[in-house]
Amino acid sequence: MHIILIHGSWHGAWCWYKVLPHLRAAGHTLHVPDLPAHGRDWRFVRGRLGLTAMTRPLCRMLDQLSEPAMIVAHSRGGIIASQLAELRPDKIHSCVYLAAYMLRNGERVADYFRKDKSSLVRKHIQIQRSSLTDSLPEHVQRETLYADCDEADVELARSLLSAEPSLPAL
């Protein structure tokens, strides 16, 4: 089966590195893209990315596959998964939302985010209005994102995290 892994906020394709060998060993064909302005894809660096720009490369990827794919999305990647399911329903076998946003029609992440009063991300997120990006300060990343990770994985992630384009969430 084709599986497309969609990373969440501030991350890139790199965040799946521990999962990939297990899925390949199970015989799956994996597609692990960096979303625009994430990971190694720095074509857009100022955050002016809407949902269309974020989903377009994945639509092209789905269009090239010979069979429907499973989508596995983490965190804010759930927004992308839902949009793909609407745009290419015949190309998607199933969607797995792994601690991901699955919003109601018309709901925005910002709306959902305001309701989640206990969220550590909500408490610590820093929004850079000039670049339309958001990020988390390094001193709260372990507590907020990596509480169950070993120190080596935390350091790896810290070295690879990037600012998140905020526009798709607004």
Q: Where are the model-predicted features located?
A:
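Gly/Ala-rich beta-loop-alpha elbow adjacent to hydrolase catalytic centers
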Residues: 72-77, 81
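Alpha/beta-hydrolase
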Residues: 115-116, 122-170
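Flexible "cap/lid" loop of the alpha/beta hydrolase fold
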Residues: 86, 91-129, 165-169
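Active-site loop/oxyanion-hole signature of alpha/beta-hydrolase fold enzymes
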Residues: 29-31, 35-70, 86-87, 110-114
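Glycine-rich His-Gly loop
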Residues: 6-9, 74-75, 100
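Conserved HGGG/HGGXW glycine-rich cap/lid loop of the alpha/beta-hydrolase fold
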Residues: 2-42, 66-69
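Active-site signature of alpha/beta-hydrolase-fold catalytic machinery across serine-
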Residues: 18, 83-87
